[in-house]
Structure formats: structure tokens, C-alpha cells
């Protein structure tokens, strides 16, 4: 049976609860959590009004969430409400936390995010991972995870799960890296290398960047392409508020769209791929600069100082991005293209030629292009928030674990 194109990974948002009385209770617990997180602090009466349940039903649900440590009472509701004040409810700053991790070509990063959405702990290790076997890299990542978990536990948090962003194709088991050309990893089961006690999800870094934009960006954004870059380039396709994964889970490999079929060879085996013109190292080569260290900072600094070689290289990269994106825009008709990752820091020099190319080539009106506020932090935040969303979407999944 073919997998659904929009299917979410097991710990991601979107898992369907059963159509039973127990399933209805679990959905209502989730509705309470989302209402309080979005609009809180709220009284029980205000929650009932928001979600359309009786006060008695909401009170029962709230009591269960308080016992589970997911909600807390703050005292009288804030001023400005009509009628008798009730006890204000807020999402707890203690209890479950989402642990997000990122394996980059030249860094490892881990963070802990509480149910309120606040980052409570973070650790980063800079250094190349290219060409290194997965085992040593993941052991270093596991050490960072333990460091962040220990720091979070001192804050009264406990890990509800671990989500790992990687620069490559991930199988639908949400743990196996099928292929990561820029790391030279193939068929690597990260689940066998990471702490077994934490529920694990592995996904492409571009997908997690897109989910960060969906969950943390403009609340009206429901149909967009989120394009991010490091050495490679990936895209998350969000349609009607859901991530489009494709049959095998490989949707969004924008970096391997050929923009010049007779161009240079790519590590993927193709020729003339977008990455060979708009990836960080490709732009550095075109500008005559040596790769190393903060590649984006180096390019941005030279461009800001008027280096014509760098500006020309970025202009050409924007043109290549525009060519590759034209097909996606014509095919999917998104509301917006969002530049994230390294592209956000280079947007002032990429946008003019990118937007010109889109305007010239798209069949309909020009597609708006925006810059993500999360930049290179998007994949890490999206990974951590995927665990948080899983708890908010099914609070009973962590009942008894506090």
C-alpha cells in the first residue's frame, strides 16, 4: 500500500486519534492545551468558551492536565475580563520538554524546548562532520543530548522525546538516513546509535525548518515553500498547513533539481544541480574565496563591503535559485517562498535576481518571497518543537511520566 503523501512521522504533529470515547477525551485534552497555550492565561470558563465545551467538562479535563503537570494555576485571572474572576490557567514551565538535535556538515547542536515554546538549554559543537563515520559523530551528538537533558532536568523538565535533523534523505521509519551525500552517509540507522530511552524521530533538516516556519512564523502561513541551504539545498513543501512528504518521504530535494543539464558533476551523481550554483561552497568558489569557518558570515561581510566578485556570485546564485524555484511555483502555486537557513543571511544580495527570475518565468502573478526570522536555527527549533507538538496534540501520551 502506498503511504499517504502527507503522512506525519510518528512523533510529529498530525497523528490521528481513534474515533472512540477515549479518543474523543484525548482530543479534548489537546484542545484545552492548545487553547491555553495560544490564548492563556485563561480561566476554565474562558477555555470552555474557546473550545465550545461545557464548563463542567472543561473542569474535568483541566484537573487531569494539572495532575499530569502540563497545566498550572496562577491565581485570579488577569484584569479586563467581565464577571467573577476565575483561577487563571497557564501551560506549565516544568514537566515535558522537546529535545531537538541537528547534525550539520560542520556542526552539531542540541536544545531543549518546554511546552510554552521557550528554549531552556542549548549546546553546540563546531567542527567538520564531512567524511567522518556516523558512529563517532553520533556519539558526540549523544553526549550533547545528555548535557542538554541534564541542564533541562535541573530546571524541572524531563525529555518527552528526541528529534534529529539531518542533511539528507530519511526513510519512512523516521530513524534511518538513506543518503546524506555531503556527509557521505548511506543507510545509517541513527536509532541504533542514540540513547534508547528517548522516543526518536529523524527527519530532513529542510522539513524541520519548514515546520518551524509553520508553527512559529506567521499564523496565516498555510501554503508555502521553505528553502534552506548549507552546503546542500533543501525545501519543505507545506500545503494547507501540512508537510508534503511524497511516497518515499523524499519530497523537497530542490538542491538536486538541474538548472544546467551540462553543468558540473554533483555528489548525488547528477550534473548541473542547483547545489553546484547556489550552495555555500559553490558561491565561495565562484567568488574566489576559500571555504572554511563561517561561510555565510564571510560572504555577507564581503558583499556588504562592496566586493564585486562576491556580489556577482550571489547574483548568479539567486538566478539559479529562481530557475529551480520556478518549476516548483508553477507546479504547486504556493502563497509564499520563504528563504531560511544560510539563505536568510544572504537574502539582500540573492533576492533581486531570484525575484526577477521568478517574475519572468512563472505562469501566474509573481510569487511573494519572504525571509525566515529563524534563519539557521530553524531546523533545530523545528525538531524540538515537533516533540512539543506531539505532547500538545496528545497530552495523555505522557500521562504518568512526570
Regions found by a protein language model. Name each.
Residues 220-277:
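Glycine-rich phosphate-binding loop of actin/hexokinase-like ATP-binding domains
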Residues 114, 171-172, 238:
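Short, acidic, Ser/Thr-enriched surface-loop or helix-capping motifs
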